[in-house]
Amino acid sequence: VSRQRVWGVPLPIFVHKTTKEILVDDMVNENIASIYEKEGSDCWFSDDPQRFLGNKYKAEDYDKINDIVEVWFDSGCTHAFVLEKREDLQWPASMYLEGSDQHRGWFHSSLLESCGTRGRAPYESILSHGFVVDGKGLKMSKSVGNVMAPEDILKKYGADILRIWVASSNYEEDLRIDY
């Protein structure tokens, strides 16, 4: 569930230098949570470890771990942070809507996290759509030179043509475009 990166949501873990035991202390965890609520979690990477430990422990006795939460695990938890925290939304979601690349990404990580913590999926259904690809069916890429900016199409043909094309297309398949 972790990665070694310099960006992302940090895992607030201290390991005792001598015993190699992970520090488990509710007061320290509450202090870290309080700081995160006010300032965000990026302070973990820059602030003095003593600030998080408080007066009960000495920073020189602990290694501060700088691993981050694995990004798919992080995104898989969003249902809890969004749907369960907002009164105008309901949990589980009616539908998760994303591209087919998310079968092994967001759909999968959300399903695993939610089933593990709540015993069911965080959504009632999922809807997968295809992607807009070039006229040959290839993924658009700046390095290949086959990218078509929607603004260019709008300038040449107008918004209504683009809307009609999208609305009349089968969302389950990749949409080929060439002009």
Model-derived features: positions:
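Structured secondary-structure scaffolds
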Residues: 1-179
